[in-house]
Regions:
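Conserved glycine-rich cofactor-binding loop
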Residues: 7-8
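C-terminal substrate-recognition "lid" of short-chain dehydrogenase/reductases
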Residues: 125, 211-238, 243
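A glycine/serine/threonine-rich, flexible loop-to-helix segment
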Residues: 39-40, 178-207, 246-253
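Conserved Rossmann-fold SDR core element
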Residues: 80, 160, 170-186, 231-238
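Substrate-binding pocket helix/loop in short-chain dehydrogenase/reductase
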Residues: 95-96, 103-105, 199, 203
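Catalytic loop of short-chain dehydrogenase/reductase
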Residues: 127, 132-158, 163-171, 183-184
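Conserved glycine-rich Rossmann-like NAD(P)H-binding loop of the short-chain dehydrogenase/reductase
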Residues: 23-38
Length: 253
């Protein structure tokens, strides 16, 4: 199983759960290299030669030779990939009047373009083992956009459409599904997106399950979809029911 952006947080939870379930895992990272190697070392101590690290910028998709190098590096540790999990993402506001070409390119590349072109590059290997593609999306990638995050919303919506388009195109050989987290990881309390205790309480109050989700909740769904041989083209909300009560709005709500 190859999980992009998997050195920390949700990605690392997916890797740990998959490894515990018996998968050999490839931990992809770029800036979080030390965390990636620490995670791999921990997993390999439990089961030798079962975890590998792939350090790469997803911008490799912009160059065909670099992309092929990424594919070969991904195949090198274990010789095959049967599950591709698109977890890497960039998330920050782009209010009207502040949108730049750089922000557009970065958010679109990470959240939409890279998943499509990586899927295409790895497709022959996934087809050979009747594998699957699983994308980590967002409950706001449908019809409940974040206010002030228009480029992110557009990119995740494109990614969601990719899931459903590829599910049709690649069936019956490769299954393609998505997972839409709600609030499963809170912003870093030291970041400019940090929320107050009152804001956190308001979020919990808006969730029918009355708790913030966890990365493990997402990991559990990834493992389910990896095994669910008759499910394709689905996007499962893992949000404690939040999307049922949400009509879009500001991050602070």
């Amino acid at each position: 199983m190859l999980v992009t952006g998997s050195a920390k947080r949700i990605g690392a939870a997916i890797v740990r759960a998959a490894h515990h379930a018996g998968y050999r895992v490839i931990i992809h990272a770029l800036s979080s290299q030390s965390e990636a190697y620490r995670l791999a070392d921990t997993l390999n101590q439990t089961r030798p030669d079962s975890a590998a690290v792939l350090i790469a910028d997803l911008a490799v998709i912009e160059d065909s030779d670099a992309l092929q190098g990424f594919v070969q590096d991904a195949l090198s540790p274990f010789g095959q990939i049967d599950v591709l999990v698109h977890n890497a993402s960039r998330f920050y506001p782009t209010a009207m009047g502040t949108i730049t070409h750089s922000a557009w390119n970065e958010l679109m590349l990470t959240n939409a373009k890279a998943p499509l072109l990586l899927s295409q590059a790895l497709l022959p290997y996934l087809q050979a083992v009747h594998g699957c593609i699983i994308s980590v999306l967002d409950i706001h990638a449908d019809d409940r956009p974040f206010v002030g995050y228009s480029v992110y919303n557009m990119a995740k919506s494109a990614h969601r459409t990719m899931v459903q388009s590829l599910a049709l195109e690649l069936a019956p050989t490769v299954r393609v599904n998505g997972i839409a987290p709600g609030v499963n990881v809170l912003p870093d309390p030291h970041s400019d997106q940090a929320i107050s205790n009152a804001q956190q309480a308001a979020i919990v109050n808006s969730i029918p399950m009355q708790r913030i989700g966890t990365p493990d909740d997402i990991a559990d769904c990834v493992l389910y979809l990896a095994r669910a041989s008759y499910i394709t083209g689905e996007v499962i909300a893992v949000d404690g029911g939040r999307s049922l009560t949400l009509a879009g709005g500001h991050m602070s709500v």
